[in-house]
């Protein structure tokens, strides 16, 4: 999908929430969506990073985004319900949701997985994603044509040694997406996954410290697929898992 050329007004008048919007793919997605007409809601745990993305968007002349400082690790379903009501009160609807926030944890043998780290990865990569989506469904249903995009990984389709915790969280992500896609297939909201592939991010450097980052795609390079799934040109795509860098 990276040969997709999005019209500049692809996301005009759309309200899109991006999690993990402070850096990496999330920050680039927010800036790209804003450049294509969206009003972005920037969610992340580090206010200074969100403010930097906010400044980039405003200085580029795009719609002023909203900032939601939230640490998914400590958030409860009640936090998400309150956020959802605020979005409805302020914007009336939610047209798009990009679940980008996730953590890797440490790669280790399955027998050595730390129980607390397992809980932390599942809280951020799975539980927070599930409860946030659950809370936001009423706002999504108020949109004319809403899109929810989950972030997956190749290890969420085929398990790999030493990737146990992260892989299980991404297998679960695929399952959540498929379940929701089937439940809402007759409604005005669609659910899909996106696999960014090897990309020049901090998480990639953590997983592959010896890898040359200059050999990898940048977050900007993979944005066409992110635009495609969020825009109305993918309105008939539901329950799919797309690769930004197909082999």
Model-identified regions with their sequence ranges:
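Conserved glycine-rich Rossmann-like NAD(P)H-binding loop of the short-chain dehydrogenase/reductase
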Residues: 38-53
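Active-site helix of classical SDR
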Residues: 133, 169
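C-terminal helical subdomain
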Residues: 186, 193, 201, 210-247
């Amino acid at each position: 999908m990276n040969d997709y050329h999005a019209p500049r007004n692809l996301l005009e008048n759309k309200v899109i929430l991006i999690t993990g919007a402070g850096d990496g793919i999330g920050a680039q997605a927010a800036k790209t969506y804003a450049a294509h007409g969206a009003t972005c809601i920037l969610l992340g745990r580090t206010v200074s990073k969100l403010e930097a993305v906010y400044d980039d968007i405003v200085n580029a002349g795009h719609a002023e985004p909203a900032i939601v400082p939230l640490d998914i690790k400590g958030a409860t379903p009640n936090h998400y319900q309150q956020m959802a009501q605020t979005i409805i009160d302020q914007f009336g609807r939610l047209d798009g949701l990009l679940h980008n926030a996730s953590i890797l944890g440490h790669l280790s043998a399955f027998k050595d997985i730390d129980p607390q780290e397992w809980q932390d990865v599942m809280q951020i990569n799975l539980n927070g994603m599930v409860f946030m989506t659950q809370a936001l469904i009423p706002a999504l249903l108020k949109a004319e044509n809403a899109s929810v995009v989950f972030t997956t990984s190749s290890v969420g389709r085929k398990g790999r040694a030493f990737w146990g915790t992260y892989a299980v969280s991404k297998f679960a992500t695929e399952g959540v997406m498929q379940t929701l896609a089937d439940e809402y297939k007759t409604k005005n909201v669609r659910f899909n996954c996106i696999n960014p592939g090897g990309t020049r991010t901090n998480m990639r450097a953590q997983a592959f410290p010896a890898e040359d980052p200059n050999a990898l795609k940048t977050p900007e390079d993979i944005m066409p697929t992110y635009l495609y799934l969020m825009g109305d040109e993918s309105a008939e795509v539901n329950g799919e898992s797309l690769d930004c860098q197909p082999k």
